[in-house]
Amino acid sequence: MTTYATDSQGKFIPATQRPDGTWRKPRRVRDGYVPQEEVPLYESKGKLFAQKPSLPPGLPPEMAQKAREKREKEQRKAAARPAQNPVPGLLILHEDNKANQRQAKPANAKPKKKAVELPDVLLEQKQKEEQKAASRQQAQDQRNSKQQQSQNQSKPLDDVTKAVQDLQLGTASGADGHSDLSKKLRKLRKKIREIEVIEERLRASDGPRPDKDQIEKAKRKAEILKEIEELERGGGHK
C-alpha cells in the first residue's frame, strides 16, 4: 500500500530506493488521486449475484434451515415410498389408504400440485399485505360513495341556478326589446313634429318655402302615423 506524507504544500509520496540503490524522486499527489493498487477490482454481474444473500430480507437463517430440513424430509419420504402401480393394471392398496382408495387412478391422471408452505414470517407478511389492500379498497369505496352523494346533492342546486340564469337572460332580452321599441317610437314622433313644421311653412304666405325633399317627407305623414299606431298597439304604449 502506498505511504503518503504531508507538508505545507499538500500530500506527496516520499522518495523511495530502487533495488539497484538509486532513489526515486518524491511525487506530489493531486486531490482525488487513487493509486493503481488501490483501485477496486472489476467484478462481473454473475459474481455480484452470487454474493447476494440467498434468503429474503428479514428471514432468520434458523427458520429457513427448519423449512429446508422439513422439505428434504418430505422428499426422502416420497422417495422411500414404493411405487403405487409398479405393473400396469396392478392395483396395490397400502394399509394407510385402503379406506380411501376404491379404484385405480387413470394412467394419464395429472398429479395434484402441492401447496407451497411458506415460513411464518412470509405468511404474516402476506397476511399484512392482504389486510392493507382490503383497507385501501374500503377507503376508495367510501370516497366514491361520498363523491356520488355530493354530486346528487349539488344537482338540484345546479338546476335552480340554471333556471335563475335563464330567467335573468329572458328579462334582459325583454328589456332590450322594450328599449328598442321606445327608441323607434321617439324617432317616428320626431319625424311627425318635423312634418308639422313643414306643413306650417306651406300654409304660411311669407317666409322660405320648403324644398322638394321636405315636401316628399311631408307626404309620408300618414304612413308614419300608421306605423306609430301599430308600434303602440304591439308594445302597449299610449
From Swiss-Prot:
GO CC terms of this entry: cytoplasm; exon-exon junction complex
Taxon lineage: Eukaryota, Metazoa, Ecdysozoa, Arthropoda, Hexapoda
Region (Disordered): 1-183
Basic and acidic residues: bias regions: 65-77, 123-133
Protein name: Partner of Y14 and mago
Keyword DNA repair: no
Similarity-based family: Belongs to the pym family.
Subunit structure: Interacts (via N-terminus) with mago and tsu/Y14; the interaction is direct.
Name of the coding gene: Pym
Organism: Culex quinquefasciatus
Composition-biased stretches (Low complexity): 136-155
GO biological process: exon-exon junction complex disassembly; nuclear-transcribed mRNA catabolic process, nonsense-mediated decay
Localization annotation: Cytoplasm; Nucleus
Keywords of the record: Coiled coil, Cytoplasm, Nucleus
Coiled-coil portions: 176-233
GO MF entries: RNA binding
